[in-house]
From Swiss-Prot:
It is found in: Cytoplasm. The SUI1 domain may be involved in RNA binding. Belongs to the DENR family. PROSITE patterns: SUI1 (PS50296). GO terms for biological process: formation of translation preinitiation complex; translation reinitiation. PANTHER family: DENSITY-REGULATED PROTEIN, DENSITY-REGULATED PROTEIN HOMOLOG. This is Translation machinery-associated protein 22. Interacts with the 40S ribosomal subunit. It comes from Coccidioides immitis (strain RS).
Length: 200
């Protein structure tokens, strides 16, 4: 019986153990690979704040000196230029995304379906980082009506809510998703067909 107990202890210690891996909060890669992305400087700052021991291991002066000593002078210069290019490119992409997000308009439209039936169509939320399906579900619950995500002819997605709730949707978006979608980017678009019909 003592032999059986000994074999059990040995077999349990031979089983593979799970490893705890730290992932970067900026680029979502392990910190060892952050240098290959475009956000190396931000990744280093994040690691310094959140895991100082690993930061010391990866970015200490001795480690950097050891890594640089294996490179030739030309390779060092190339590595420095590449790192600068990657950082500049990442900064440019980030500013473009912010500009695009600031310029993106969310259009809320009232569309006539039948003689007295209307739907409200909301387009452009995905540009502000909102998930159309989740927002459609929230709208359906909020207004107790049918709400779905549909494809528009241009190939994008839009949310269709049954009923004429343009003003209410505008107020709700400002109240609930005001951080993601600034009020200046929300606009109610009038249906041009109705204006023509009213003019005649």
């Amino acid at each position: 019986m003592a032999e059986a107990a000994d074999t059990e202890v040995q077999t349990t210690s031979l089983e593979p153990q799970a490893r705890h891996i730290v992932y970067c909060g900026v680029c979502s890669l392990p910190p060892e690979y952050c240098e290959f992305g475009g956000t190396a400087k931000k990744c280093e700052e994040w690691l310094h704040e959140n895991n100082p021991s690993m930061h010391q291991k990866l970015y200490s002066e001795e480690t950097i000196a050891a890594n640089l000593s294996t490179l030739s002078i030309q390779a060092r210069e190339r590595a420095a230029k590449d790192a600068a290019k990657k950082e500049a490119k990442a900064a440019l992409v980030e500013t473009r995304n912010q500009e695009r997000k600031a310029a993106a308009k969310v259009q809320i439209k009232r569309v006539e379906r039948n003689k007295r039936k209307h739907v409200t169509v909301i387009a452009g939320l995905e540009a502000h980082g909102l998930d159309n399906k989740k927002v459609a579900k929230e709208l359906g619950k909020k207004f107790a009506t049918g709400s779905s995500v549909t494809k528009n002819p241009a190939g994008g997605e839009e949310i269709t809510v049954q009923g004429d709730v343009c003003e209410d949707v505008l107020e709700w978006l400002v109240e609930v998703h005001g951080k993601e979608v600034p009020e200046d980017n929300l606009e109610i678009v009038e249906d041009k067909k109705k204006k023509k019909a009213a003019a005649e």
